[in-house]
Every structure is written in structure tokens, then in C-alpha cells.
Amino acid sequence: MSAIERSTEILGGQTSLAKLLGVSQSHVWNWINRKHQAPAKYIRAISEATRGEVSVKELLTDHEDTN
């Protein structure tokens, strides 16, 4: 499971994460199902929203795994 998927589960779903970040649920769906990573500009906010349960390092690893 990718870090972005874990983040979504922790926060209660794609819609919840999208609202926290000010994006649409479809953006989050694309990150999970097409890109398998969150855009870099959201990584710190996602980690903070999960209260560190998903670290910045884990979210960055998603980027490394797809390159």
C-alpha cells in the first residue's frame, strides 16, 4: 500500500483528505490510482494531517518508487 493510500485510510477517505487539502476528491483518486503518489506540494500537509502516522519520508518514497 502506498503512503498516499495509507493517508487516505487514516483520514477517513478520499473526500476527507481532499477537503483538508482544498482539492477535489477526483484529484485524490488520481493520485492513488494513476500516479501512486501525492504531488510534492501537498506532502507536508498530508503528513501533518495524519499527525505523523505517515511521514514526509514515506510520502517522498512514493515518488522514488515510481521513477
Q: Which residues fall in each region the model found?
A:
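Short amphipathic helical patch at the helix-1/turn junction of helix-turn-helix
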Residues: T8-E9
